[in-house]
């Protein structure tokens, strides 16, 4: 389908032990979960819904996908190089949901529950209802996640000061978190005629939580944080039969926090209460136009305007009657504007060669930066014969930092030894990417790519030379370069066994010539391999055993070294009752407790070792569908730049 590879997700997952949209996506060739996020062919990917990007963060989008039953997915479009009309950056996964109407009014639904046990227990309850009429469809979903979590972090820091003194600071931190996450979505659609429809969607979440940390060793500390974030998002999308698409979206996000800390450090003490809040108002409007012309030509153009206001504050109050060097109280208000205007064309040469090219002009404005960028995207797809697809893509795009990262705020971790500071001078990063993808027999996928990213930003750690403090700060590097090869190969033995093997090899280089007083230019070659196995034990009732594994070799990130890691998961799914309405799943994740990466630093006098806990998860889930339940879905909000 043009520059997209379209997958029948229902057929791919119908006998696999997955029960939500997020896990269903991991069954697609080349889609791999890394650090809790979905990647495509070894690179980060943007997930969009029904062709539209939203204001939800990646973390919120992940939670939404995990609460959506897999049966609501119609198909999935994989784009290694998304055209400008999608207004996304680089690789893209477009989920198309079922939006059904019916000649007779119909109400269907599903109830779902899961119990998950690691060190502590967690739960989820979910209910979905879908109404289908002749013209109107209404879709409602509510989910409630709640429970406790526990983790430990052991840190050994060999801290050298400029006066020649060296301090060994060893800490052991225990963290306990309890909380709730309520999510609700209501989507209403009305079909006036073919290719003429209006959809309005509301999404809301409320996730109060409390975390308590205790640190012992060289530092003794008690720390607590209460969070109370709210999200409201409403979006409207109107498609007209002559190719016009207009829409608008509004997002409100409010995240108040209260922190308390009492610490005895190697060189002093720290006692305070801190109150902070991030409040965002984000508006977006867009208009798009597609023309289908003669002789296989197509033309598209459009514009998107988004504006956001960030009104945030942070206050510190000492809890002892002695002088302390606490951060200043700060209240900040910032506005950001982004304008994206694009035009593109496509040409189909007898279903053998398909060209899709576009050029976007993007304007970015905030109190620190004011700039225009030209963002070209080119895709050329050659189909020499049935079952063979060769695709070349080139693109350039910009990525913007989180709102909180560009505020001049300060907070603490590890009992006050770690100081997290903002960076108002952060610049957007600009990536240039080229890739070549070959699909053999419509199932084997081979891919090679190269990317160059100017002003790459990420959070770094630095041991200060004049004081016993570690500074965590999001900084711009000179550049990052990546070159990689990926192969995704499906395997099958009769009707009883099927599998997907994904092999990935990457060369990575990162350079920062002004990283404090220790500039770096580091590179490494690493590999990652995943194997997803499904054993089909019985058809009546339908019983499937899934055993999945992943291993990743040593990698790096700035001055960090990332040791090898991996995990093995298993799940047993049973579908029973009439029309397989009931589904029972038993699972165990991270069986050998090896998934956690324990980073360390040993670079130009900086030395740090971390050992973080990793607990296996086992649990059981049950779902029951009623009323010939088939699902549909709505779109999501990009909250990737909100405070987490």
Residue ranges with predicted function:
Residues 523-644:
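Conserved C-terminal beta-signal and adjacent last beta-strands/turns
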Residues 478-553:
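Gram-negative outer-membrane beta-barrel transporters
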Residues 22-57, 85, 93:
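Extracytoplasmic beta-strand/coil segments of soluble accessory domains associated
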Residues 54-80:
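Short acidic/polar hinge/loop motifs at secondary-structure boundaries
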Residues 1, 21-24, 61-63, 88-112, ...:
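N-terminal periplasmic accessory domains that precede
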Residues 113-119, 133, 144-148, 204-208, ...:
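Transmembrane beta-strands of outer-membrane beta-barrel pores
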Residues 136, 181-208, 224-373, 381-387, ...:
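Face-selective signature of the C-terminal outer-membrane beta-barrel domain
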Residues 398-448, 452, 470-484, 489-492, ...:
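Outer-membrane beta-barrel signature, preferentially recognizing the C-terminal barrel domain
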């Amino acid at each position: 389908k043009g520059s997209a590879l379209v997958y029948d997700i229902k057929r791919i997952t119908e006998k696999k032990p997955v029960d939500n949209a997020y896990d269903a996506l991991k069954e697609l060739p080349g889609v791999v979960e890394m650090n809790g996020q979905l990647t495509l062919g070894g690179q980060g990917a943007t997930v969009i819904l029904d062709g539209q990007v939203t204001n939800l963060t990646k973390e919120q989008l992940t939670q939404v996908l995990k609460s959506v039953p897999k049966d609501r997915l119609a198909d999935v479009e994989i784009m290694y190089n998304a055209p400008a009309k999608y207004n996304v950056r680089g690789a893209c996964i477009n989920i198309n949901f079922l939006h059904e109407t019916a000649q007779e009014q119909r109400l269907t639904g599903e109830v779902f529950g899961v119990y998950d046990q690691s060190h502590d227990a967690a739960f989820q309850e979910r209910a979905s209802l879908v109404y289908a009429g002749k013209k109107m469809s209404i879709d409602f979903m509510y989910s409630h996640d709640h429970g406790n979590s526990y983790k430990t972090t052991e840190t050994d820091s060999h801290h050298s000061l400029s006066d020649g003194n060296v301090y060994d600071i060893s800490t052991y931190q225990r963290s306990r978190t309890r909380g709730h996450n309520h999510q609700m979505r209501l989507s209403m659609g009305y079909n006036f005629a073919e290719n003429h429809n209006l959809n309005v969607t509301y999404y809301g979440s409320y996730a109060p939580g409390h975390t308590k940390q205790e640190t012992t060793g060289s530092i003794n500390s008690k720390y607590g944080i209460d969070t109370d974030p709210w999200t409201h998002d409403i979006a409207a999308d109107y498609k007209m039969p002559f190719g016009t698409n207009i829409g608008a979206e509004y997002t409100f996000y409010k995240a108040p926090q209260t922190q308390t800390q009492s610490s005895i450090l190697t060189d002093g003490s720290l006692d305070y209460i801190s109150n902070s809040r991030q409040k965002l108002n984000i508006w977006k409007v867009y208009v798009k136009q597609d023309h289908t012309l003669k002789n296989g030509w197509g033309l598209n153009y459009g514009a998107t305007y988004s504006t956001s206001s960030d009104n945030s504050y942070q206050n510190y109050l000492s809890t002892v009657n002695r002088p302390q060097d606490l951060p200043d109280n700060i209240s900040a208000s910032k506005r950001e504007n982004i304008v994206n205007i694009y035009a593109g064309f496509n040409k189909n040469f007898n279903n053998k060669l398909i060209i899709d090219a576009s050029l976007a002009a993007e304007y970015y404005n905030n109190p620190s930066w004011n700039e225009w960028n030209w963002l070209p995207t080119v895709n050329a797809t050659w189909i020499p014969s049935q079952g063979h697809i060769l695709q070349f893509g080139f693109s350039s795009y910009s990525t913007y930092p989180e709102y909180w990262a560009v505020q001049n705020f300060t907070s603490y971790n590890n009992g006050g030894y770690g100081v997290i500071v903002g960076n108002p001078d952060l610049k957007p990063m600009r990536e240039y990417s080229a890739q070549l993808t070959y699909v053999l027999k419509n199932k084997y996928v081979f891919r090679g790519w190269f990317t160059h990213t100017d002003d790459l930003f990420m959070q770094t750690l630095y041991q200060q030379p004049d004081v016993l403090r570690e500074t965590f700060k999001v900084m711009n590097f000179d550049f990052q370069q990546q070159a990689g090869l990926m192969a995704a190969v499906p395997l099958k033995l009769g009707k009883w066994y099927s599998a997907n093997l994904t092999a990935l090899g990457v060369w990575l280089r990162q350079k920062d010539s002004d990283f404090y007083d220790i500039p770096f230019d580091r590179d490494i070659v690493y590999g990652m391999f995943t194997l997803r196995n499904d054993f089909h034990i019985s058809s009546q009732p339908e019983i499937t055993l899934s055993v999945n594994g992943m291993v990743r070799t040593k990698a790096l990130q700035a001055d960090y070294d990332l040791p090898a890691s991996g995990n093995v998961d298993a799940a047993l799914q049973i579908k029973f009752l009439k029309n397989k309405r009931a589904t029972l799943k038993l699972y165990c994740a991270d069986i050998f407790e090896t998934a956690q990466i324990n980073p360390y630093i040993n670079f130009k006098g900086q030395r740090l070792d971390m050992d973080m806990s990793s607990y296996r998860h086992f649990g059981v889930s049950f779902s029951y569908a009623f009323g010939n339940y088939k699902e549909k879905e709505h779109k999501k909000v990009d909250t990737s730049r909100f405070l987490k």
